[in-house]
């Protein structure tokens, strides 16, 4: 209620995530969804963990405003799941996906590749096992090691080994090949959808559509201004839930960087016309990558990263930002 005044237009998408919303009491979920006007939104997504998908939860889903479910499968190999501290088994993930498919035709499943001990054969088994469930949408991410996390500490202690880049590239190639064969559109670096089932909510981030984030650690982008809430609950409560603890007014350079980083994540790509004063520098950088095939032009003349280069796109993005 304290931030309702920031919503100048009707809410088009709602996304309950950033944690484990599926572990909340359905009555609380109903209150949250009602407060944000979810019943009027075109897309309402909730993130779930396989272990939270019970008969009662599925029953609640069927009568709620939620019309899209995103579930973290991560792997269909028991040892790999245990290695990254996941609570569910492969069997539980498969059963949960089948339960959810009974109440929604818009099911998104998440996978991770580059897991400790994972080889190409194991990755293919997980990938094909998930595709056999025919989800409307698939997200697949390369495992990252973030400072301060359990995985980071284990790697630093020599208890696990990070997958070599050459293996990650092979895994990504297998992913692109399998999803294309199954009829999915590869519309963003890590996202694949059946026709008509792209994530509207996530696409709004990549299109720089304004969004409001609620809860500890949530980010917002409103009126060209970025803000993010304190990540700790006491700090969030002290800020009154307003998200005004930290505010960043973007410079022209930062707006250009945002445009590059978001647009070049997608198959739609970047229009040079949107680059403003940085257009000449952007075109110069693009020519080098167009020449070696790392980038290509769409039929509409938009610039995008070639699918085979998406996994190493960070290097390309840095070149554009530094141009």
Please place each PLM-identified region on the residue numbering:
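C-terminal scaffold of the Radical SAM
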Residues: 1-5, 9-278
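Minor-groove-contacting beta-hairpin "wing" of winged helix-turn-helix DNA-binding domains
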Residues: 301-306
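An alpha-helix initiation/capping motif
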Residues: 169, 280, 307-310
